[in-house]
Amino acid sequence: MTKYTNADELKSLTLGQKTEYKHTYEPELLQAVPRSLNRDDLALGDELPFVGCDVWTLYELSWLNQNGLPQVAVGEVALPATSPNLVESKSFKLYLNSFNQTKFTSWDEVKETLVKDLSACAGETVKVDIFPVQRYSQQPIVDMQGECIDDQDIIIDDYEFNAAYLESSTSDVNIEETLHSHLLKSNCLITNQPDWGSVEIQYKGKKIDREKLLRYLISFRQHNEFHEQCVERIYTDIMKYCAPESLTVFARYTRRGGLDINPFRSSHLLAPKDNLRLARQ
């Protein structure tokens, strides 16, 4: 359990509660969660050790045009990691549902509305793009970059989070490499529902022991935090124990409620080059 599980800021969230679905535009449905909750737990100050963003894909985005004809689109949203708040995912889903029976004059108006409301919730300007469904029908399914570390003949008998797996995990060999794992699984901070993800780790520095890294990632299996918080924990733990010269951590989670969340944290990159789907997305 994290130190902030019972924080007052979490008690008013609709997540985990029975809610009424609204079908006409209602921006008040959006709920913010202060990023400071887990960053205080990680002893992060105002000067963050990373940059990056949270990339959301919106698969259930629909509204009515001026003639009442339903429109559908796929949206992509990027929330800067520097924003004071993250957007709680169930409230995001409920907010998007409120578009369903609302008339908009154009696709641009929908985009402008999303930018305005999400930026107000996050506390910083949010980037939004919306695309026709046809664009996504042509998008390939890809794998993460680098080598997969999952196929190791090791025994796992501990599934409690333990950053100490990364202690003494580097050698004297300097390397620049990209590794990935599909075994990332954590649980929702509020509901305990499982969150399934894949994570890509790109670094330059002392070579990291792959067995220890995999044991560390598997230790999230019973851990309760939001997606964004897990990725920031992975980033800060690798920096603490492995001290690479540069580091990028990118996780892509399976969708829930028509949304997938893909947190990206880096020592030097503001955003991933592409937003491409994995097999489980």
Swiss-Prot record:
Its EC number is 1.7.1.13. NADPH binds at residues 89-90, 256-257. It holds the Pfam family QueF_N. It catalyses: 7-aminomethyl-7-carbaguanine + 2 NADP(+) = 7-cyano-7-deazaguanine + 2 NADPH + 3 H(+). GO terms for biological process: queuosine biosynthetic process; tRNA modification. InterPro entries: GTP-CH-I_C/QueF, NADPH_dep_7-cyano-7-deazaG_red, QueF, QueF_N, QueF_type2. PANTHER family: NADPH-DEPENDENT 7-CYANO-7-DEAZAGUANINE REDUCTASE. Catalyzes the NADPH-dependent reduction of 7-cyano-7-deazaguanine (preQ0) to 7-aminomethyl-7-deazaguanine (preQ1). NCBIfam families: QueF. Belongs to the GTP cyclohydrolase I family. QueF type 2 subfamily. This is NADPH-dependent 7-cyano-7-deazaguanine reductase. The gene is queF.
